């Protein structure tokens, strides 16, 4: 395993540096033994892009992960002593307000050290963008327009407002940030 070789090399070199990684919750590194090795090699922070706390939404996004894998990866990293950052998005295709509330509950249940809550923006070249165009959720190809006529006041495509408008998405995102960072247990850390 290449990761083992890299970690062993860092341990043997005894450089005294710390570092961070971004990883998938479904990776082979998401076990206690590997997380402990990463920590010993100087890894002190790990980032996980989970995106949703609803399996149906994760499947629609084709993330190829499960909520159980996310829970396990965060737990393993925490047990190893790492700082854990998680990432979640609101406004995904077919995501309802109730799903966003479930995502917030899931994020809180993980007890990660940090969480970033963002609003989904479909970008050109992604399957999400192409599908939103095909389904009429984006009215026209904004990126093609920009590529053919770059202007300084370009605005990215509208959000996918299938089940929630921008005002609702912003309110949910702000609520998520408040609830995550103003928990008594979080404040007392």
Where are these regions (language model features)?
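A structural motif corresponding to the C-terminal lobe/cap of the Radical SAM core domain
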Residues: 7-188
């Amino acid at each position: 395993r290449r990761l083992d070789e890299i970690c062993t090399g860092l341990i043997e070199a005894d450089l005294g540096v710390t570092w961070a990684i971004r990883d998938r919750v479904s990776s082979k590194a998401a076990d206690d033994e590997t997380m402990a090795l990463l920590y010993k090699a100087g890894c002190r922070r790990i980032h996980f892009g989970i995106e949703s706390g609803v399996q149906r939404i994760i499947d629609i996004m084709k993330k190829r992960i499960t909520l159980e894998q996310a829970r396990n990866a965060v737990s393993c990293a925490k047990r190893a002593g790492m700082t854990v950052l998680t990432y979640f998005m609101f406004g995904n295709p077919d995501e309802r307000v109730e799903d966003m509330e479930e995502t917030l509950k899931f994020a809180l249940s993980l007890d990660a050290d940090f969480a970033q809550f963002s609003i989904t923006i479909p970008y050109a070249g992604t399957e999400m963008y192409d599908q939103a165009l095909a389904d009429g959720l984006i009215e026209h190809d904004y990126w093609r327009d920009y590529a053919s006529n770059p202007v300084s006041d370009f605005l990215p495509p509208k959000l996918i407002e299938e089940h929630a408008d921008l005002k609702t998405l912003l309110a949910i995102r702000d609520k998520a940030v408040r609830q995550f960072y103003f928990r008594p247990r979080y404040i007392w850390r």
